[in-house]
């Protein structure tokens, strides 16, 4: 999404045209191949990425930090306790100040509106590294991972099991952008927000919703799940017993296509949303997903910065 000043923000998959998302994905594949071949690329030497963490994360911090360093740049980490974002200083003022110091801002936060406000007032690119509503960087890594293992994602069917959370919201947006289908199995009361489903359907995604996990898994090309309780939402979580039928185990995987993959954004609560047998099994690509956060995010950074005359 480009604002009135031509700044490219990576807000959500719904805010970036399908052609540009595909270009980012192909760039990620190419950058990964060059890295594996030992090529060194440092187009952003001297550039700085500010990383705002109001919700901490191993994968997000390390993958963005390493990614920016591999591109030749540097990072600075700012935690919520250090910044008091929106408390001792308004989000708008913080955005304006940081824009004078750094070349891009990544934010991992709670309320989606906080990230949107930061992007509204920043004069450098803002990247959504996670909010309570969406997780677009993760899903770009997931699409990359699927295509590495199984080829084009177009026309395939993903089956989601468990809580209708931020990862699912970005998954259905990806379904519209990359032309695949999503079968959603959630217990009553844990459905995804309707605005994301409505947008995905209006933009061509095939979305099926059910409370029956076996129905959702039937013939699927990939089964995806996440923790039953998201970080920071433990006090509002429903009892785990309602999610037990949605555990991804060998019996549920057997309902999918024999070549189906298993995905999880990690960290996983083994024995809850997924069994050891599945997550450590031959259909699991969870650690490829984790690695591909690095490559996808490098391509996202490049997309955000290229049109600002900052390398390639």
Swiss-Prot record:
A GO biological process held by the record: arginine catabolic process to ornithine
Q: What class of enzyme is it?
A: transferase
List of residues binding carbamoyl phosphate: 57-60, 84, 108, 135-138, 265-266, 293
Choose one Gene Ontology CC annotation of this protein and give it. cytoplasm
Write out the entry's keywords from A to Z.
Arginine metabolism, Cytoplasm, Transferase
The places in or outside the cell where this protein is found are: Cytoplasm
The entry's function note states: Reversibly catalyzes the transfer of the carbamoyl group from carbamoyl phosphate (CP) to the N(epsilon) atom of ornithine (ORN) to produce L-citrulline.
Q: Which PANTHER family match?
A: ORNITHINE CARBAMOYLTRANSFERASE, MITOCHONDRIAL, ORNITHINE TRANSCARBAMYLASE, MITOCHONDRIAL
According to UniProt, the name of this protein is Ornithine carbamoyltransferase
> What's the source species for this entry?
Brucella abortus (strain 2308)
User: Which gene is annotated as encoding this protein in its UniProt record?
Assistant: arcB
């Amino acid at each position: 999404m480009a604002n009135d000043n031509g700044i490219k923000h990576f807000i959500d998959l719904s805010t970036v045209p399908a052609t540009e998302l595909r270009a980012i994905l192909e760039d990620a594949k190419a950058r990964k191949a060059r890295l594996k071949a030992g090529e060194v690329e440092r187009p952003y030497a001297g550039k700085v990425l500010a990383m705002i963490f109001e919700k901490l994360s191993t994968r997000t911090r390390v993958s963005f930090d390493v990614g920016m360093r591999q591109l030749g740049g540097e990072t600075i980490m700012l935690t919520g306790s250090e910044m008091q974002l929106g408390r001792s200083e308004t989000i708008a003022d913080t955005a304006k100040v940081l824009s004078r110091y750094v070349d891009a801002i990544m934010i991992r936060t709670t309320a989606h509106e906080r990230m949107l406000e930061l992007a509204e007032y920043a004069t450098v690119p803002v990247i959504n590294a996670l909010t309570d509503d969406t997780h677009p960087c993760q899903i770009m890594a997931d699409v990359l991972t699927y295509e590495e293992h199984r080829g084009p994602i177009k026309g395939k069917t993903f089956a989601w099991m468990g809580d209708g959370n931020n990862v699912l919201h970005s998954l259905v947006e990806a379904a519209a952008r990359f032309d695949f289908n999503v079968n959603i199995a959630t217990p009553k009361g844990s459905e995804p927000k309707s605005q994301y489903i409505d947008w995905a359907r209006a933009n061509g995604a095939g979305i099926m919703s059910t409370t029956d996990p076996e129905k959702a898994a039937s013939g699927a090309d990939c089964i995806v799940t996440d923790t039953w309780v998201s970080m920071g939402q433990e006090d509002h979580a429903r009892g785990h017993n309602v999610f037990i039928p949605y555990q991804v185990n060998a019996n549920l995987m057997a309902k999918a296509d024999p070549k189906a993959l298993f995905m999880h954004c990690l960290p996983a609560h083994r024995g809850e949303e997924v069994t050891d047998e599945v997550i450590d099994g031959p259909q699991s690509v969870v650690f490829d997903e984790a690695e591909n956060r690095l490559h996808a995010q490098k391509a996202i950074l490049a997309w955000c910065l290229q049109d600002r005359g900052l390398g390639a």
